Amino acid sequence: FRGLGMDMELLAWLNTNTFPEEARYRDLKYAKEAYRIFAQDMKKSATTRACVFATRHVDSTLLLMNLMEKTGLKTMIGKVNMDRNAPDYLIESSVQEALDETKDWLKKTHGKFNNVTPILTPRFTPACSDDLMKELGALREKYELPVQSHLSENRDEVAWVKELCPWSAFYGETYDKYGLFGGRNQNTVMAHCVYSGEAEQRLMKENGVFIAHCPESNTNLASGIAPVRKYLDDGQKVGLGSDVAGGSTESLFKAMVSAILVSKLRWRLADESLKPLTVPEAFYMGTKGGGAFFGKVGSFEPGYEMDALIVDDSFLAWPKERNLRDRLERVIYLSDRCELRAKYTA
């Protein structure tokens, strides 16, 4: 359902588009066809590794994991948890149901995959009660699982979290209280971080939380522009995300371009102290920056795993010979006119 409902903001889009679509995945026939398309698109894309949200349904999540295993890509896939503020047709009816289904899913994935890893996935704080967060934190600690979720994406969402969790000083604390926000050698990635304040940023850095910058999604849903220049300058861990279906494409090349474009708008219109991103910085976020969530990935340096693309840029012919840096920039900006000849994932 990419490319639909792009005239709405986040919360309206979730209720109008996302939740009704996700409910269809309880039908395995529908899920198989939809996930087959997704797996094929991912295999054809420039992506070698990804974190993926499935739905709350155990069987369809396992189906997606099986399909992604066959692509050869390295992925972390999560069964979504949500026990409040969701439609009756999609919500997990109790903390116990959510916990039982999540344990069942983890049991069924144990030792089954070479390329796919389970990742705990509380949808976001508005959809997960404190009791559920507490139980998921215990699961994370017991099984040493990575975590993915959303953080400070939309102004209305941030205000809603404050209403739901008045005890929290900021959004990130609603995860951190239950051990779901990095720290203790835990791998956590939070999408968006558009409105993360200074205290939240300090905790992210202290706990080693990864930021998945999703510029196209943040633009499509009118969420805002994350201060990525500040994150990079402060030494935060930052990678790029497509956030489909909030984003309309899985292309990381387009994510790189979007990241540069929105940083220029933020610099010009909102804060001239935060200089725009450069092409090398955007490329770093799409390779080594995001790859670090998976280990030593995203570079050709000694000791790194061999993830690589062979890209044919001969379609970008020009009378003047180009150096390697210029060729890379053109591939990033004109990726639709290039051809991906091969892809390798360690």
Residue ranges and their predicted role:
Residues R2-A31, K79, R84-Q96, N154-N185, ...:
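Active-site gating loops and adjacent loop-to-helix segments of metal-dependent hydrolytic enzymes
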Residues R2-L73, A98-K112:
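Alpha-helical scaffold segments that flank or form the walls of functional sites
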Residues A50-V52, V147, G239, L309:
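Hydrophobic residues within beta-strands of alpha/beta enzymes
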Residues D59-V194, A199:
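Metal-coordinating catalytic core of metallo-dependent amide/deamination hydrolases
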Residues L180-L316:
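Active-site-adjacent C-terminal substructures of enzyme catalytic domains
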Residues E305-A346:
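C-terminal cap of metal-dependent C-N hydrolases
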